[in-house]
Amino acid sequence: MLMYKLMSEFHLEWGITLLTLNFSYFLFNSYQIKANWPLSYSTILVSLFVLLWLTFTTQSFILFYVFFECSLIPTIILILGWGYQPERLPASYYFLFYTLLSSLPLLFIIIAHTSIYSSSFLQFWGNFMDKMIFLLAILSFLVKLPVYFAHIWLPKAHVEAPVTGSMVLAAILLKLGGYGLYLVQVLNIYSETTLMGVCLMGGIFSCLICLRQSDVKSLIAYSSVAHMSFVILGMLMSCTYTNMSSILMMVSHGICSSGLFYLSYLFYARIWSRSFLLTRSMISLFPYLCFWWLSLSFLNMGLPPSLNFFSEMYFFIGAFSLDWMVVGLSGILCFLSSCYCIYLYSSTSHGESLYIFKLISMQLKGMYNRKSSSDSVTDFNFRLLL
């Protein structure tokens, strides 16, 4: 079948299965649930992973759509049930209506295709789509990734979701859009120069927005928009190198972004704030935690030999043979991505903290010293990250 050929080309089937197993093991072993209903929490996570596994392995496009949309339900329950702030309700509305309304054209296309060909398998889709239908079909995937101008729901959902919801959303749920875009794009070769321009300029604007953020979690959320712009751009170029670049970027972003969300939660659990004004000079209190923060920031900005580095290398190899303008704007996007990664690390780990915050930090340090008995605060942080 076509889907299995596509997955075997880049070993996606095994990679997705291992990624799901790794994240399920990580979530159930490293995160201690403090809610009143841990059984309900675990049930929601298990149901979410089952839906994701079914989405990535089904051959029928209509089943892919059903599982694709059903994965929204556990995520919204996580945001509503275990979010931190009252704003989680409008964030859930944004998440639901953006993703649901954008997927309606895809549903109508699937129904029309099934009525014409009496099949919803992917190998028949190549003869069915023209350019306009192709754009309507990928709209749902573009919003899910998301593309700039349809990204409003992502920062709201990330900021209001619990740490587990943010990690799963960044690591796997956003990749559903990239996976669907890849499956449709390899069947229909259309060079969408306008959409490519939107991705490039949207990625640059997202990087500039990141440099103006004062909330750690919000910055990480907007960085996802910038990285996903690279993914969409690579898919739309319809080149072997750029397709490989997009796949590597999605895997790398899933690891780095979820790790950064987890570390931001550890900061929040210690100082009860995500503001850059209150998270300065953290390296003096939590050096091991800042070491992992630095490592993930370097991986996120594409230093060799990270996956991001090889992803960008494949992208520029493919882009050089297509359009020099794309190469120039993509270089600016890579530079700005490095800038906000450096800003993210330096604003939290270094700098001069507020005087009153130093007093609070001393009290927090004493609390964690008592909590870890004879162990130091840094050893306690290191054990959490292992």
Curated annotation (Swiss-Prot):
Signal peptide: none annotated. Its EC number is 7.1.1.2. The chain crosses the membrane at residues 8-28, 37-57, 61-81, 91-111, 133-153, 167-187, 189-209, 219-239, 247-267, 283-303, 315-335. It is a multi-pass membrane protein. It is found in: Mitochondrion membrane. It catalyses: a ubiquinone + NADH + 5 H(+)(in) = a ubiquinol + NAD(+) + 4 H(+)(out). InterPro entries: NADH_UbQ_OxRdtase, ND/Mrp_TM. Keywords: Electron transport, Membrane, Mitochondrion, NAD, Respiratory chain, Translocase, Transmembrane, Transmembrane helix, Transport, Ubiquinone. Belongs to the complex I subunit 4 family. Core subunit of the mitochondrial membrane respiratory chain NADH dehydrogenase (Complex I) that is believed to belong to the minimal assembly required for catalysis. Complex I functions in the transfer of electrons from NADH to the respiratory chain. The immediate electron acceptor for the enzyme is believed to be ubiquinone. This is NADH-ubiquinone oxidoreductase chain 4. It comes from Artemia franciscana (Brine shrimp).
